[in-house]
A protein has these predicted regions:
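RNA pseudouridine synthases
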Residues: 1-295
Length: 295
């Protein structure tokens, strides 16, 4: 694979880890072994990349992941022969990946729900959409391929209902608003998302529920489902999600991770056509933090 450096000034190993899927250590390994070329030449890790440099690197073979059903507690809000709705706890990864082969939502689903759709492959059975590891709340699960196709199409057509509660930094100037700003991979750090003209359209609606001076409780409704959408949009308007260590400030509310909860989920049942809507209460630590902010 190759990338073209748009902004110079970084060490070669740092540029590779920021702009590609390689970790810093793997980038260094490839540089030392001569697998990384800059404009066709081998360079050392300390080389400072320049604007216009073409860097060629090696994409490692994907790991063969082994995973099993695990008896992990899981709150199943609803279940029938086609779909299920689960309340994912904060801190749980949705599906297995390198470094996360156990303890994921998929491991739990395989234990609690025997029939899952296979459209997303063996690593993501039943998974129609995702929420971040540190976001709690509702997810729809497909139990067969027909249901999966229907639910995925509804998400694509922006017909499903997804509302979140978040504690954010600061006091928003308006009680309601719409954030319409395209989101794509950050050009400065490829592991992050950012508002960028090259991104895909992204729309988030917000409603301030309660104000606490330095923080606000906000309900957000997604019209699109970009990676990290709420976190990126709220940071973009200067009110990042509290506890967000990636897009927020270092000084923030402690003890929970990010205060973001997928509270309401609505969709059309793929078989019956019935409109279903579910709500999951915010976690106890979220409630305790709100009580503390009110004092």
């Amino acid at each position: 694979m190759e990338i073209k450096i748009e902004t110079g000034g970084l060490r070669l190993d740092k540029a590779l880890s920021d702009l590609t899927e390689l970790s810093r250590s793997l980038a260094n390994e490839q540089i030392k072994s001569g697998q990384v070329l800059v404009n066709g030449q081998v360079k050392k890790a300390k080389y400072t990349v320049q604007e216009g440099d073409v860097v060629t690197y090696h994409v490692p073979e994907p790991e063969v992941l082994e995973y099993v059903a695990e008896e992990i507690p899981l709150e199943i809000i609803y279940q029938d022969e086609d779909v299920a709705v689960v309340n994912k706890p904060q801190g749980m990864v949705v599906h297995p990946s390198a470094g996360h082969t156990s303890g994921t939502l998929v491991n739990a689903l395989m234990y609690h729900i025997k029939d899952l759709s296979g459209i997303n492959g063996v690593l993501r059975p039943g998974i129609v959409h995702r929420i971040d590891k540190d976001t709690s709340g509702l997810l729809m699960i497909a139990k067969n391929d027909e249901a999966h196709l229907a639910l995925a199409q509804e998400l694509k057509d922006k017909k499903s209902l997804r509302k979140y509660w978040a504690i954010v930094h600061g006091n928003l100037p308006n009680d309601r608003g719409v954030i319409e700003a395209p989101i794509g991979r950050s050009e400065k750090d490829r592991k992050k998302q950012a508002v960028t003209a090259k991104g895909k359209p992204a729309v988030s609606r917000f409603h301030v529920i309660e104000r606490f001076g330095d923080y606000s409780l906000v309900e957000l409704q997604l019209e699109t489902g970009r990676t990290h959408q709420i976190r990126v949009h709220m940071a973009y308007i200067g009110h990042p999600v509290a506890g967000d260590e990636v897009y927020g400030p270092r000084k923030t509310l402690k003890g929970h991770g990010q205060f973001l909860h997928a509270k309401t989920l609505g969709f059309t049942h793929p078989r019956t056509g019935e409109t279903l809507e579910f709500t999951a209460d915010i976690p106890d630590i979220f409630k305790e933090t709100l009580e503390r902010l009110r004092k």
